[in-house]
C-alpha cells in the first residue's frame, strides 16, 4: 500500500502553480482523512517542484507562490542540466518511499487522481497515461496545430490495456509512480542532456533489469500545445538525440528500424540526396495553415 508519496515536478520556463494547487488539494484531503487511521496507514506527502534553470524571470517569480502551500517546495536552480539530470535531482531530494513524476505542462482531470493511484495494487512502477481533449471546440481551435494533430492521430496512450500489451515500449516518464529505491539504483541516464527519448531508454532499463510496469487508467490531461515551428525544432532535437544513442536504443525505435531497412534496400543514398531538396518545402507546409501528418512522418 502506498502511504508515503513524493510528488516530483520538473519545470522550465513554465508557471505550474495551478497544477500544484490541484495536487495539493487532493493530497491534503487524503492526509486529513487518514488522521484517524493507525500510524502504519497514515498518508504522508510532499510536492517538490525543481526549476531547471529557467530564463524567464516572470515564471520564476510566479512559481514562488508554491512555497506558501503546505507540504510544497519550489527549488530554484540556476543551471539548466536537462530532463534526465533534473529528475535524478528530484529523486535524491525526495524523502518518501514512493515517487510520482509529473511534467509541469500537464493538468489534473480527475478529482480522484491521487486516490486512484493509492488504491492500485502495489507494483514497482505504475504508469497512468495521458489524454488530450477531443471535443469539437478544441478540435476547431487547434485544427492547424501540428502537435495536436500528431497527438490526436495516436490513441495508444489513452488505453491502458493496449499499453499493457507492450509495457516497456509504451512507457513515458510523466505521470508514473516508482519506488524511490529503484530509481536511485537505476537513475535516468544523464548523457541525455537534450530533448527526447529519455523515456524510451528508461523503459529499456526497466526491462533489462526485469522490473515490471503496471499500466492503469489514471491519465493526466495534456492541453498545452506549442506552435508548429517550435514543435518541429523539438522533433529535430529529439532525432539528433536518437541518432546519438542509436546503439543503446536499438530495437526500441521504429525510426531506427526504418533506417536499417533503407540501408538494406540500398535507398540511403537517394534519401540523402532528396532530403535537402525537399526539406524546406515540407517545413513550409508543416508550419503553414494546413500541416500534414503524412509529411511530418516523412
Question: Locations of the language-model features?
Answer:
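Acidic donor-binding loop at a coil-to-helix junction in glycosyltransferase catalytic cores
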Residues: 194-202
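Conserved donor NDP-sugar-binding/catalytic core segment of glycosyltransferases
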Residues: 111-143
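Short, flexible, basic/aromatic active-site loop/helix in glycosyltransferases
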Residues: 146-168
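Short aromatic/hydrophobic "clamp" motif used to bind/position activated sugar donors
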Residues: 99
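A conserved acidic beta->alpha catalytic loop
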Residues: 51-62, 103-107
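Non-catalytic, C-terminal membrane-associated alpha-helical segments of glycosyltransferases
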Residues: 234-245, 251-298
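Glycine-rich, basic loop-to-helix element that forms the pyrophosphate-binding segment
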Residues: 77-94
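Short, well-formed alpha-helical segments that are part of the catalytic scaffolds
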Residues: 13-37
Amino acid at each position: 500500500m502506498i502511504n508515503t508519496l513524493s510528488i516530483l515536478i520538473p519545470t522550465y520556463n513554465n508557471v505550474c502553480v495551478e497544477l500544484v494547487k490541484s495536487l495539493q488539494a487532493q493530497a491534503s484531503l487524503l492526509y486529513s482523512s487518514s488522521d484517524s487511521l493507525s500510524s502504519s496507514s497514515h498518508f504522508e506527502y510532499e510536492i517538490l517542484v525543481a526549476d531547471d534553470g529557467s530564463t524567464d524571470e516572470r515564471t520564476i517569480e510566479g512559481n514562488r507562490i508554491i512555497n506558501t502551500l503546505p507540504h510544497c517546495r519550489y527549488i530554484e536552480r540556476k543551471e539548466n542540466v536537462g530532463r534526465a539530470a533534473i529528475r535524478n535531482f528530484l529523486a535524491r531530494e525526495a524523502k518518501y518511499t514512493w515517487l510520482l513524476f509529473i511534467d509541469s505542462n500537464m493538468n489534473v482531470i480527475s478529482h480522484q487522481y491521487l486516490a486512484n493511484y493509492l488504491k492500485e495494487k502495489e507494483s514497482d512502477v505504475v504508469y497512468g497515461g495521458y489524454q488530450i481533449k477531443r471535443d469539437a471546440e478544441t478540435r476547431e481551435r487547434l485544427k492547424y496545430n501540428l502537435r495536436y494533430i500528431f497527438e490526436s492521430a495516436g490513441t495508444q496512450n489513452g488505453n491502458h490495456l493496449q499499453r499493457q500489451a507492450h509495457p516497456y515500449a509504451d512507457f513515458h516518464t510523466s505521470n508514473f509512480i516508482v519506488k524511490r529505491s529503484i530509481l536511485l539504483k537505476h537513475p535516468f541516464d544523464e548523457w541525455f542532456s537534450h530533448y527526447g527519448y529519455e523515456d524510451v531508454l528508461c523503459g529499456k532499463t526497466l526491462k533489462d533489469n526485469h522490473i515490471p510496469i503496471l499500466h492503469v487508467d489514471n491519465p493526466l490531461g495534456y492541453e498545452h500545445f506549442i506552435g508548429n515551428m517550435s514543435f518541429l525544432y523539438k522533433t529535430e532535437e529529439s532525432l539528433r538525440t536518437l541518432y546519438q544513442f542509436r546503439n543503446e536504443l536499438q530495437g526500441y525505435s521504429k525510426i531506427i528500424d526504418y533506417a536499417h531497412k533503407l540501408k538494406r534496400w540500398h535507398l540511403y543514398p537517394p534519401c540523402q540526396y532528396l532530403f535537402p531538396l525537399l526539406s524546406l518545402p515540407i517545413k513550409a507546409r508543416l508550419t503553414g495553415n494546413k500541416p500534414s501528418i503524412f509529411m511530418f512522418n516523412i
